[in-house]
Amino acid sequence: MYIEQHSRYQNKANNIQLEYDDRQFHTTVIKDVLLWIEHNLDQSLLLDDVANKAGYTKWYFQRLFKKVTGVTLASYIRARRLTKAAVELRLTKKTILEIALKYQFDSQQSFTRRFKYIFKVTPSYYRRNKLWELEAMH
């Protein structure tokens, strides 16, 4: 009886350890992917490419990314691109169109629409304004 009970507890403990190891591994994979994304924000980042980089199918990677980060891959990439664009608006003399195209927006109009949605002001107003909108930055 004692051996049986001990064996069940040992199995549960082993399963918990395996789940923990699995979570740790997935978190490490996602951290590596986040770093890779950060260095490639000015490139086309298709779900297939990012999932392949991680070594998963796109379906599994989407679920894993959301589980680990709390946001979808597309939302994360868009937020990071907009934040980088906001910094460039302040620190460079590049045109809004140049910045929009650099960060993979189809047009200045689509960039302005997304930028205004996140930062609550247009890119041109943001560039002229002296205060940094840190709350909207991701």
Curated annotation (Swiss-Prot):
Q: PROSITE patterns annotated for this entry? A: HTH_ARAC_FAMILY_1, HTH_ARAC_FAMILY_2
DNA-binding region, residue intervals: 48-69, 96-119
SMART domains, per the entry: HTH_ARAC
Under InterPro entries, the record lists: Homeodomain-like_sf, HTH_AraC, HTH_AraC-typ_CS, MarA-like
Task: Show where the HTH araC/xylS-type domain sits.
Answer: 31-129
Q: Which Pfam families match?
A: HTH_18 (PF12833)
Query: Molecular function (GO) terms listed?
Result: DNA-binding transcription factor activity; sequence-specific DNA binding
Q: Coiled-coil stretches, from where to where?
A: none
Keywords per UniProt: DNA-binding, Transcription, Transcription regulation, Transposable element
NAD found in the keyword field: no
- Protein name, per record: Transposon Tn10 TetD protein
Organism field: Escherichia coli
